[in-house]
Amino acid sequence: MKKFLLFILTFTFSFSYSQLSTRTIEVKDGQMSKFIEMAGKKTKKFNNEDGAARFWTYEILTGSDAGKIWRMQAATPEMRDNWDMNSEEVEYWQKNVSPYIANGSVNGNYMWNYAGPYSHNVDSENQNHVMMLVYTYKDSGEQDFWRFRERVVAARKAMEPAPKGSMHSVVCSSGCNGNVAAILFEYESWADQQNYNQEMLPKMIEKYNELYGNNAYEQDGSKVDKALTENGRGRIHLRFIPEASSD
């Protein structure tokens, strides 16, 4: 995940929001290892050079899409405008990767903006276990929702030691119903996540209250609850696959 961080930071040096797209891929039964191998070869061949789009690949571990692939692309608007469906890159994918996709099942093409001010990036290694929290908030709740995210970032940055894994925030810009945001937390493993929840999360809450007043975390969290739509909160776990991702 470190290279993901470096690429995103390069984008966000010039502007606060970077454009991402995601899609969900269903792999044929028994072909996951082959899909990962061939998707990795394609990605290493075409998506590591300057001026090329970058891709990151995850396996979905929980939820209705468990067992599928979640693939993220980062590209500038110029890259998207000049995308050629007849390019060598696309032909390589169709010839070498598509045969392992079930019935051409590539779904859920969503566009996201990377929300740099609401993300906390640390120089981490081996943080390949990801928890993604997905929120849908009301128009009237936008300020309360993002104030809380901003304060969480400030509290994390003030912690000593800082959390080992990064926290990335993205906002859906196309394809979603309503105001959708996703927060991705990086860990080394399930055990590392449990350890964070038991040891680091209470320290983060303590720092939050130290910065913003007694019980501020609980009060702001309550405002977020009211800011969300009905059933506007979800949780998905992912496994980052570095061998099928840009370096």
Each language-model region and where it sits:
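Bacterial Sec-dependent N-terminal signal peptides
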Residues: 1-20
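Short S/T/G/P-rich N-terminal loop/turn motif that feeds into the first structured element of a domain
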Residues: 17-247
